[in-house]
């Protein structure tokens, strides 16, 4: 259980310290909650922060659960940086079904990314098994067997606003 996204991001960034100093590397976050985590990782590692706009299609009656996902090309917060031949640390505040992250990974591979490290605070074991063959490295702090929604693993899990995302990306 994490206190909030800040605590989760700090814990995750400590597991990524070996990436500090890697050239041609970028942290990419899934907006909006993932940007809080991504900002901490990027600042800790001295890497640029960008976003990959994979959006979930919510399950009716369970908005935190993805029925599917797609790449949003509206570029609300700016475009996804060039990832060709780069090392990417892909992050979010957690993974439930894996649909959103899987969509992001496929998008990055089409853009000829160099290597992908998927780093998230929490994801269910069955989803981790499904995703591990899609990335070069997987760093997940908690992999519970019983999983309802990402928010269950945070004491404080408010919605992140567009304004907060813009501020994190600007600073």
Task: Identify the meaning behind each predicted range.
Residues 1-171:
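PRPP-associated nucleotide enzymes
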């Amino acid at each position: 259980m994490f206190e909030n996204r800040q605590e989760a991001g700090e814990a995750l960034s400590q597991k990524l310290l070996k990436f500090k100093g890697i050239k041609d590397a970028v942290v990419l976050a899934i907006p909006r909650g993932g940007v809080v985590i991504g900002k901490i990782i990027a600042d800790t590692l001295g890497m640029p922060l960008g976003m990959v706009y994979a959006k979930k299609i919510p399950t009716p009656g369970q908005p935190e659960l993805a029925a599917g996902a797609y790449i949003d090309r509206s570029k609300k917060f700016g475009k996804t940086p060039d990832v060709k031949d780069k090392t990417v640390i892909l992050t979010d505040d957690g993974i439930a079904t894996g649909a959103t992250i899987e969509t992001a990974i496929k998008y990055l591979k089409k853009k000829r990314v160099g290597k992908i490290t998927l780093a998230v605070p929490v994801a269910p074991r069955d989803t981790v098994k499904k995703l591990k063959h899609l990335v070069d490295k997987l760093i997940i702090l908690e992999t519970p067997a019983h999983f309802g929604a990402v928010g269950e693993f945070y004491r404080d899990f408010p919605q992140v606003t567009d304004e907060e995302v813009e501020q994190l990306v600007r600073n």
